[in-house]
Amino acid sequence: MSAGGSARKSTGRSSYYYRLLRRPRLQRQRSRSRSRTRPARESPQERPGSRRSLPGSLSEKSPSMEPSAATPFRVTGFLSRRLKGSIKRTKSQPKLDRNHSFRHILPGFRSAAAAAADNERSHLMPRLKESRSHESLLSPSSAVEALDLSMEEEVVIKPVHSSILGQDYCFEVTTSSGSKCFSCRSAAERDKWMENLRRAVHPNKDNSRRVEHILKLWVIEAKDLPAKKKYLCELCLDDVLYARTTGKLKTDNVFWGEHFEFHNLPPLRTVTVHLYRETDKKKKKERNSYLGLVSLPAASVAGRQFVEKWYPVVTPNPKGGKGPGPMIRIKARYQTITILPMEMYKEFAEHITNHYLGLCAALEPILSAKTKEEMASALVHILQSTGKVKDFLTDLMMSEVDRCGDNEHLIFRENTLATKAIEEYLKLVGQKYLQDALGEFIKALYESDENCEVDPSKCSAADLPEHQGNLKMCCELAFCKIINSYCVFPRELKEVFASWRQECSSRGRPDISERLISASLFLRFLCPAIMSPSLFNLLQEYPDDRTARTLTLIAKVTQNLANFAKFGSKEEYMSFMNQFLEHEWTNMQRFLLEISNPETLSNTAGFEGYIDLGRELSSLHSLLWEAVSQLEQSIVSKLGPLPRILRDVHTALSTPGSGQLPGTNDLASTPGSGSSSISAGLQKMVIENDLSGLIDFTRLPSPTPENKDLFFVTRSSGVQPSPARSSSYSEANEPDLQMANGGKSLSMVDLQDARTLDGEAGSPAGPDVLPTDGQAAAAQLVAGWPARATPVNLAGLATVRRAGQTPTTPGTSEGAPGRPQLLAPLSFQNPVYQMAAGLPLSPRGLGDSGSEGHSSLSSHSNSEELAAAAKLGSFSTAAEELARRPGELARRQMSLTEKGGQPTVPRQNSAGPQRRIDQPPPPPPPPPPAPRGRTPPNLLSTLQYPRPSSGTLASASPDWVGPSTRLRQQSSSSKGDSPELKPRAVHKQGPSPVSPNALDRTAAWLLTMNAQLLEDEGLGPDPPHRDRLRSKDELSQAEKDLAVLQDKLRISTKKLEEYETLFKCQEETTQKLVLEYQARLEEGEERLRRQQEDKDIQMKGIISRLMSVEEELKKDHAEMQAAVDSKQKIIDAQEKRIASLDAANARLMSALTQLKERYSMQARNGISPTNPTKLQITENGEFRNSSNC
């Protein structure tokens, strides 16, 4: 009876904790992520007295969590393929019962850790590249669904806290049709997903001024609540639920101590914390669990400093006159950060990247500990994006070593910038490692009931041995998990630690490197994470008192182990662990050597998270602006140009609109805003400067069967159609280019090299923005031409692609696979942009447009019609013809693949010869007189204006960036100055002392073109002469054929060079693989040798033990033999006695027989004996007759 009651109690308690904590074990073994549908939220005002279900019910019971098959779910150009088979999900493991012993799971943990280590050691071949998040949005039927963002007016993308769904690493996409939740496998994967989707919705985020809102909030504790109840809070921002705390039992106070952080928030008005009491399901009368709320105006906690206060709880039914009501202590900070376009931070980022050491030395004495932490965080994030973080940490650490001198014990014991920087870097790149190494161990410890208190003043003497055994067991397990985690140790940290070891050796102090590594990793990362798992995102819940004490003791032992120190008289009650410490020192030394050995750098991917570089630069600027103002003038003068740079950025911040780059205003505000109209700034410029007649729709060569569709639109670089909202993707077998070089930020395309494009209007939109689709703009503008009475500005028209070209996958690129060309902002291969900006032209125009990742889509008929219309001299007629069929035009891909007048090479699939475009056409005949200011549209289409000199259009083509750059999008087809193009360069633009913006450059170029046009109007030949020139062009077909063959030869030569380069790269890759496999083989041999040595040591120990056992057995045998001999003597004496007794017995039997015979004879004779004979036994065993005595 009692056993059954106990079992029911155990089951009830387990389910109680399961319902309370709602932390189902994460399925990290999942081969995919899954999508979920969020139910509609319920605002706190709409809720009745009863609270909604606790976290976890959503993911366990709601039937609407999986996407409906009837709902279309499509991402444009994104996950557009089906996977070949369904991917099964591993089952969720049940939570460990709280009253189960932690000791029971120790063998499982040990075997799992050993198996993981052995498995990792056995992997001599490189791992397969695991599937990225672009393959992880799967429905249960394994069909890929899509979410169409192209037609949405407003899309909200935000992370979902784990307390809402009971699942970590989720995010939500909210559109007009509803919201979808998606689950990822890690925080880094979730951040990359969210950023890619945000860039799909707002492609020009880095090129525009934006504002970001950040909230950090601690729900600490509550007081004046009824005892013996459990309480929890819900956090709502503007009446939208964002997170929940765990339920905590009331003792003195209800202590939660939980931290929440939210980024990319909309502007907030109020922060509301709702207080609930957990209801007991057994008591049906307890229905009203809602206790009240605390409302914080966002303005009251705005600023850089945290605000911590006790806030009264406003209850629904206040009871006056009965003392103070409940109160909650909350600590919060709400920040609004203004972020300028990336171009505005370029000089600032370059200065920080190159002069961080002097800056830190100047600011170290005046900064507070909190400011040092914030500044170190911003510096680490920025330098991680620029690839300089290893040098930064190494330089700071060596300066710290020089400062401390012989006082090695002071290193990492003070709040310096170096200490804070390594802390932030460990948190940045080591979060996943921390989860893999200690996550399961900490969770199991939370769920166990082992008591590890070993202080005699806090526990009884009878329980002390058991508690000491518990603590030793937990420490063994924790250290086992740590030393076996070397196989998943982050590659970046290994590189940093290896650099420290190398620098210490070069300074003649190799002994201090081990202290640096152990102190940084254990003192500043692992041990604090063990003591406070909630602060390191291992768990949300703050531990209870017993668990907190256990974690503190484990951290003490681990830290002493890392310091190679024993417990002394200060903590004498821990001295029983000294034997464990001494035993594990060797393993600790091996672990520290392993994680700092440059020869064992693994093939694993580097940091995969996303860094918002604009936000970090804005934060660092505000910190430096405040700090530099406090410095003395003598110190400020040593900072070089930094004060001026800070002033420039501050001026841009304080001037609304000054940070907006030309041509980027509201490009992504609505899907069609940039497509339906041209830039207001350009319209104003056209009106004021009377330039509308100068924008020319030019037909380059005479129409032939091969080149009759070659047109281009000259358009201002300040105008850019709004890109269609689409989502970026990458193939599963494509290298992860976005995170090359240690995970550069997507917005660092223009900040990683000092020789970036001079005078460009903005930084590139990023590596993941898909090609712009401008058909809608073309259709609307072409349709509007006939209705205009004045000449039409065609700047908003989309550029026209050659016939037979259409977007395709990046894998079809003619250049290096997977390495898209770097595009300047607003260029889209527009020749006008290239000429106006004075930029070196990319050689991408020399080959097929497939080098940009495009194949073809025919716009043949449109181009043919436009050519015919231009030939007839009536451009407006062609416009009217196209206006009648805008749908057909909109369906065709329109883009320009030839860069700015660079020699156009015919397509390889051309059916016949073509005249080269770079050959100057014959001089045109003089046009009829026309007003200077305006040119009619029909005149624009009939006149054959001479093109600018080849020095402007077809200048030499150096690389976009320098050889030392680490840009992810650097083109492999650009190899310096092209020898074929140099002879054609007539002149080059000289360097301008002032770098105008793109709009001014375009205006200047148009004015220049106007002057050339007017000069040619007065000097051109007459129309009959033009006809004769055309007949000469028709007779020069042989020259055209020769030009075509020369172009093909040049293309073949270029391809040959590319193939040679590719072959060299492949050869280098093969050599690297051979060296890597050789290193792995040597590592395997070394590992086998170490294993053999360990086995030899074990065998020697076993043999010595057997010999000692044999000696003990011999001694025992001798003792037993002596005992046997003594027993044998006793047995012999007993045998003799038994023999004598047998003889006496035989005589007795014979005497009895005689007596019997004697009595029987007397009875037959009738004589009765008067005196019966008495027999007596003598001493020697014989019988004696008593009558004879």
UniProtKB/Swiss-Prot annotation:
One of its GO terms (molecular function) is kinase binding. Residues 20-38 have a biased composition (Basic residues). Residues 653-668, 715-731, 938-955, 966-976 have a biased composition (Polar residues). Residues 193-311 form the C2 domain. Changing S728A: Inhibits phosphorylation and TNF-alpha-induced MAP3K5 dephosphorylation. Reduces interaction with 14-3-3 proteins, AKT1, a regulatory p85 subunit, MAP3K5, RIPK1, TRAF2 and TNF-alpha-induced MAP3K5-JNK signaling and apoptosis. Residues 1026-1159 form a coiled coil. The record marks E172, V173 as: Breakpoint for translocation to form KMT2A/MLL1-DAB2IP. SMART domains: C2, PH, RasGAP. Induction: Down-regulated in prostate cancer and medulloblastoma. Residues 387-595 form the Ras-GAP domain. Residues 39-49, 1023-1035 have a biased composition (Basic and acidic residues). Changing R413L: Decreased GAP activity toward RAB40C. Does not inhibit interaction with MAP3K5. It is found in: Cytoplasm; Cell membrane; Membrane; Cell projection, Dendrite. Keywords: Angiogenesis, Apoptosis, Cell cycle, Cell membrane, Cell projection, Chromosomal rearrangement, Coiled coil, Cytoplasm, Developmental protein, Growth regulation, GTPase activation, Immunity, Inflammatory response, Innate immunity, Membrane, Phosphoprotein, Stress response, Tumor suppressor, Unfolded protein response. In response to TNF-alpha-induction, phosphorylated at Ser-728; phosphorylation leads to a conformational change, and thus, increases its association with 14-3-3 proteins, MAP3K5, RIPK1 and TRAF2 in endothelial cells; also stimulates regulatory p85 subunit sequestring and PI3K-p85 complex activity inhibition. Expressed in endothelial and vascular smooth muscle cells (VSMCs). Expressed in prostate epithelial but poorly in prostate cancer cells. Poorly expressed in medulloblastoma cells compared to cerebellar precursor proliferating progenitor cells (at protein level). Low expression in prostate. Down-regulated in prostate cancer. SUPFAM superfamilies: C2 domain (Calcium/lipid-binding domain, CaLB) (SSF49562), GTPase activation domain, GAP (SSF48350), PH domain-like (SSF50729). Residues 669-678, 852-865 have a biased composition (Low complexity). The record marks R413 as: Arginine finger. Functions as a scaffold protein implicated in the regulation of a large spectrum of both general and specialized signaling pathways. Involved in several processes such as innate immune response, inflammation and cell growth inhibition, apoptosis, cell survival, angiogenesis, cell migration and maturation. Also plays a role in cell cycle checkpoint control; reduces G1 phase cyclin levels resulting in G0/G1 cell cycle arrest. Mediates signal transduction by receptor-mediated inflammatory signals, such as the tumor necrosis factor (TNF), interferon (IFN) or lipopolysaccharide (LPS). The DAB2IP gene is found epigenetically silenced in numerous aggressive cancers, like prostate cancers and medulloblastoma tumors. Epigenetic suppression of DAB2IP by EZH2 is a major mechanism of DAB2IP inactivation in human prostate cancer and increases metastatic potential. It is linked to A chromosomal aberration involving DAB2IP is found in a patient with acute myeloid leukemia (AML). Translocation t(9;11)(q34;q23) with KMT2A/MLL1. May give rise to a KMT2A/MLL1-DAB2IP fusion protein lacking the PH domain. On plasma membrane, exists in an inactive form complexed with TNFR1; in response to TNF-alpha, dissociates from TNFR1 complex, translocates to cytoplasm and forms part of an intracellular signaling complex comprising TRADD, RIPK1, TRAF2 and MAP3K5. Interacts with DAB1. Interacts (via NPXY motif) with DAB2 (via PID domain). Interacts (via PH domain) with ERN1. Part of a cytoplasmic complex made of HIPK1, DAB2IP and MAP3K5 in response to TNF-alpha; this complex formation promotes MAP3K5-JNK activation and subsequent apoptosis. This is Disabled homolog 2-interacting protein. It comes from Homo sapiens. The gene is DAB2IP.
